[in-house]
Amino acid sequence: KFGKVLKFLAKTLAKHLAKKQAQS
């Protein structure tokens, strides 16, 4: 179960970083 949460967080973080990169 914890691994699933970690995977979700990683996905969210990646999405957030991608958005930040696109803005720059």
From Swiss-Prot:
Keywords linked to the UniProt accession: Secreted, Toxin
Cellular component terms (Gene Ontology): extracellular region
Subcellular localization, as worded in the UniProt entry: Secreted
Tissue: Expressed by the venom gland.
One function term, GO molecular function aspect: toxin activity
Top-rank lineage group of the source organism: Eukaryota
Main localization, broad class: secreted
Family per record: Belongs to the cationic peptide 04 (cupiennin) family. 05 subfamily.
Protein name per the record: Cupiennin-5a
Species this chain originates from: Cupiennius salei
